[in-house]
């Protein structure tokens, strides 16, 4: 199934008229949140950037700053995220995951494991332009051990391109993983890192099938048994992303909402970052793999203007 987002360019777009609607929604007493959320969720990111430019031209004011002073809570966070230029959004999330005391490994793992080599190259460039530092250096400074090594391998963005599959190499890699884990006292983490971090996607899908045949285990079961902590989470995220990026992100969204409390940071990040890439596919995978739809789960787990905006971005129910 071809990848598609839920948010596209609005036809008949008029940035100046939109800027006027937003100014009116925030001027005077009270704020018209409905006008803001209905308008911004129906525009692509590129169009939102144009609206912000028109807003500054017409009123001499910064649209995002105005919204920050008028809106609050999760709804404010969501709207501010929608206004970040797409190419900077992942870089921004990574920067914040690395900033200050403590590292948000969950964010590092999710973004670096699920982005394609092309996307990772663009993220590295945006990060350097925006923050004046090298993403890989910052990651190395904030992580350690095999977890750090796997992140560095992925950040090289040198995964083999998808070409004709070499069955002999598939067999060799599957055997090497079996020997590095299940057949060994201890684990040869480097073998897992090299194979999972550098082989092509189509090759690895075949390796996972072959691994099941020779070992009797899914590769995920072996990773679960043989590794732990951040490295385990990263290797599992890579394997799941190799199998299907939309399925991995659907699972990420599911666990952000399942049980008590909601991980709103993850919910906002995945919905916003994928809304123009593959959120439609993520929705389909969500419906297929869980006993509910993404739309229903958001509806039951969030409230107010925040809920309204997320549902509009989600783009519909999947029965």
Swiss-Prot record:
<protein>
    <recommendedName>
        <fullName>Annexin A5</fullName>
    </recommendedName>
</protein>
<feature type="repeat" description="Annexin 3">
    <location>
        <begin position="168"/>
        <end position="240"/>
    </location>
</feature>
<feature type="modified residue" description="N6-acetyllysine">
    <location>
        <position position="68"/>
    </location>
</feature>
<dbReference type="GO" id="GO:1901317">
    <property type="term" value="P:regulation of flagellated sperm motility"/>
</dbReference>
<dbReference type="GO" id="GO:0005544">
    <property type="term" value="F:calcium-dependent phospholipid binding"/>
</dbReference>
<feature type="cross-link" description="Glycyl lysine isopeptide (Lys-Gly) (interchain with G-Cter in SUMO1); alternate">
    <location>
        <position position="27"/>
    </location>
</feature>
<dbReference type="GO" id="GO:0097211">
    <property type="term" value="P:cellular response to gonadotropin-releasing hormone"/>
</dbReference>
<dbReference type="GO" id="GO:0042995">
    <property type="term" value="C:cell projection"/>
</dbReference>
<feature type="modified residue" description="N6-acetyllysine">
    <location>
        <position position="77"/>
    </location>
</feature>
<feature type="modified residue" description="N6-acetyllysine">
    <location>
        <position position="95"/>
    </location>
</feature>
<dbReference type="GO" id="GO:0042383">
    <property type="term" value="C:sarcolemma"/>
</dbReference>
<dbReference type="GO" id="GO:0001786">
    <property type="term" value="F:phosphatidylserine binding"/>
</dbReference>
<dbReference type="Pfam" id="PF00191">
    <property type="entry name" value="Annexin"/>
</dbReference>
<feature type="modified residue" description="N6-acetyllysine">
    <location>
        <position position="99"/>
    </location>
</feature>
<dbReference type="GO" id="GO:0009897">
    <property type="term" value="C:external side of plasma membrane"/>
</dbReference>
<dbReference type="GO" id="GO:0097066">
    <property type="term" value="P:response to thyroid hormone"/>
</dbReference>
<dbReference type="GO" id="GO:0005615">
    <property type="term" value="C:extracellular space"/>
</dbReference>
<keyword id="KW-0111">Calcium/phospholipid-binding</keyword>
<keyword id="KW-0702">S-nitrosylation</keyword>
<comment type="subunit">
    <text>Monomer. Binds ATRX, EIF5B and DNMT1.</text>
</comment>
<feature type="cross-link" description="Glycyl lysine isopeptide (Lys-Gly) (interchain with G-Cter in SUMO2); alternate">
    <location>
        <position position="27"/>
    </location>
</feature>
<dbReference type="GO" id="GO:0072563">
    <property type="term" value="C:endothelial microparticle"/>
</dbReference>
<dbReference type="GO" id="GO:0043065">
    <property type="term" value="P:positive regulation of apoptotic process"/>
</dbReference>
<feature type="modified residue" description="N6-succinyllysine">
    <location>
        <position position="288"/>
    </location>
</feature>
<dbReference type="GO" id="GO:0043025">
    <property type="term" value="C:neuronal cell body"/>
</dbReference>
<dbReference type="GO" id="GO:0007596">
    <property type="term" value="P:blood coagulation"/>
</dbReference>
<feature type="modified residue" description="Phosphoserine">
    <location>
        <position position="35"/>
    </location>
</feature>
<feature type="repeat" description="Annexin 2">
    <location>
        <begin position="85"/>
        <end position="156"/>
    </location>
</feature>
<dbReference type="GO" id="GO:0005509">
    <property type="term" value="F:calcium ion binding"/>
</dbReference>
<keyword id="KW-0677">Repeat</keyword>
<dbReference type="GO" id="GO:0030425">
    <property type="term" value="C:dendrite"/>
</dbReference>
<dbReference type="GO" id="GO:0008021">
    <property type="term" value="C:synaptic vesicle"/>
</dbReference>
<keyword id="KW-0106">Calcium</keyword>
<dbReference type="GO" id="GO:0030195">
    <property type="term" value="P:negative regulation of blood coagulation"/>
</dbReference>
<dbReference type="GO" id="GO:0005388">
    <property type="term" value="F:P-type calcium transporter activity"/>
</dbReference>
<comment type="function">
    <text>This protein is an anticoagulant protein that acts as an indirect inhibitor of the thromboplastin-specific complex, which is involved in the blood coagulation cascade.</text>
</comment>
<dbReference type="GO" id="GO:0012506">
    <property type="term" value="C:vesicle membrane"/>
</dbReference>
<dbReference type="InterPro" id="IPR001464">
    <property type="entry name" value="Annexin"/>
</dbReference>
<dbReference type="InterPro" id="IPR002392">
    <property type="entry name" value="ANX5"/>
</dbReference>
<feature type="repeat" description="Annexin 1">
    <location>
        <begin position="13"/>
        <end position="84"/>
    </location>
</feature>
<dbReference type="GO" id="GO:1902721">
    <property type="term" value="P:negative regulation of prolactin secretion"/>
</dbReference>
<dbReference type="GO" id="GO:0017046">
    <property type="term" value="F:peptide hormone binding"/>
</dbReference>
């Amino acid at each position: 199934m071809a990848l598609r987002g839920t948010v596209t360019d609005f036809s008949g777009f008029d940035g100046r008229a939109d800027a006027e609607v937003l100014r009116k929604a925030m001027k005077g007493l009270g704020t018209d949140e409905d006008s803001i959320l209905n308008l911004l969720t129906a525009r692509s990111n590129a169009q939102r950037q144009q609206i912000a430019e028109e807003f500054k031209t017409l009123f001499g004011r910064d649209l995002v700053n105005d919204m920050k002073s008028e809106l609050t809570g999760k709804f404010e966070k969501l709207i501010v995220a929608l206004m970040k230029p797409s190419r900077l959004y992942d870089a921004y999330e990574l920067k914040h995951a690395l900033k200050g005391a403590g590292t948000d490994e969950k964010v590092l793992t999710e973004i670096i494991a699920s982005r394609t080599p092309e996307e990772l190259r663009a993220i590295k460039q945006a990060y350097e332009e925006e923050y004046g530092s090298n993403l890989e250096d910052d990651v190395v400074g904030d992580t350690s051990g095999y977890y750090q090594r796997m992140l560095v391998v992925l950040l090289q963005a040198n995964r083999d391109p998808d070409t004709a599959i070499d069955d002999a190499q598939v067999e060799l890699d599957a055997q090497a993983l079996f020997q590095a884990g299940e057949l060994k006292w201890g684990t040869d983490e480097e073998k897992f890192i090299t194979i999972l971090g550098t082989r092509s996607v189509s090759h690895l899908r075949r390796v996972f099938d072959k691994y099941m045949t020779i070992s009797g285990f899914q590769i995920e079961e072996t990773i679960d048994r043989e590794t732990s902590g951040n490295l385990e989470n990263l290797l599992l995220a890579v394997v799941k992303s190799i199998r299907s990026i939309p399925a991995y992100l659907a699972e990420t969204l599911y666990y952000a909402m399942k049980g008590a409390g909601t991980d709103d940071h993850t919910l906002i990040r995945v919905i916003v970052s994928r809304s123009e890439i593959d959120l439609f596919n993520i929705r389909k995978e969500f419906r297929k793999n869980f006993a509910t739809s993404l739309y229903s789960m958001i509806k039951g787990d969030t409230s107010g203007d925040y809920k309204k905006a997320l549902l509009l971005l989600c783009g519909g129910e999947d029965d």
